[in-house]
Amino acid sequence: MSNISDAFKNGKAFIGFVTAGDPDLDTSLEIMTSMAQGGCDLIEIGIPFSDPIAEGPVIQEADLRSLENGTTTDKVFELTKKLREKVDIPLVYMTYLNVLFKYGYDRFLQNAKDSGVSGVIVPDLPFEEKNELQSVADKYDIDVISLVAPTSEDRIKMIAGDAKGFIYTVSSMGVTGMRSEITTDLGSIVSHIKSVTDTPVAIGFGINTPEQAKKYSAFADGVIVGSAIVNLVAEHGKDAPKYVYDYVKSMKDAIK
């Protein structure tokens, strides 16, 4: 069993995402350390990919900046090992099937384990193919995180019943990015999930203000924020750690 459940032991969880290697690997390490210091309960580390289909323009551009800087999957593993020496909160990777295929499931997951990572999120992994990856991940105590999008009640329950670590509930169809308003009936999706599993539920895609975080954490176990953090990195570059710290703290304070 992974340590992901630790993220949900101190009340509502704030989960932050950042692209590894943007603006550079050293600053990335500082940014992720400041995220933990600001109150992140779990960090999603994005392994950059040239065609991140689930991402909106903010994270797509971060992936391209990182790749142009020479970031590789191996360098992300090394970066994560350094981060693991500085923070003790759970860490998960977010990447795409192509990255796993090229690397090989077993070798990727072995390196993820050695880097101190507890889970992987693969947005383009079909639910029907999840077991193949999870069977390898089980060898290394790594959870393959399930994503639940607005869909039929039966499918929501099927995906949730099989989930490990936490359930990433997608607030709206489409790509990641900041939204001023989320119209999906997330309350009913979360209640469908909770009717079949005790696995914690976190809501992501579009959350960027303390008010939104407070609203959705009222019925979910945590909130996930990516684009708003990545946007601060794009805006402030090497000076981003202090801005990210302040932002994370404001979001965590809102859901306490």
Where are these regions (language model features)?
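Active-site-adjacent beta->alpha loops and helix N-cap segments on the catalytic face
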Residues: 1-7, 49-59, 71-81, 101-107, ...
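N-terminal amphipathic alpha-helix/helix-capping segment at the start of soluble metabolic enzymes
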Residues: 1-18, 79-85, 256
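Hydrophobic faces of well-ordered beta-strands that scaffold small-molecule active sites
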Residues: 14-18, 43-45, 91-95, 120-122, ...
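Conserved, mostly hydrophobic/aromatic
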Residues: 16, 35, 46, 112, ...
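Glycine-rich beta-to-alpha transition loops that act as phosphate-gripper elements at the mouths
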Residues: 19-24, 94-101, 126-127, 147-151, ...
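Catalytic cores of alpha/beta
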Residues: 25-35, 151-161, 203, 207-223
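Glycine-rich phosphate-binding active-site loops on the catalytic face of alpha/beta enzymes
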Residues: 40-51, 117-121, 126-129, 171-177, ...
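Alpha/beta catalytic cores of nucleotide-metabolism and tRNA/nucleoside-modifying enzymes
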Residues: 191-199, 208-214, 218-256
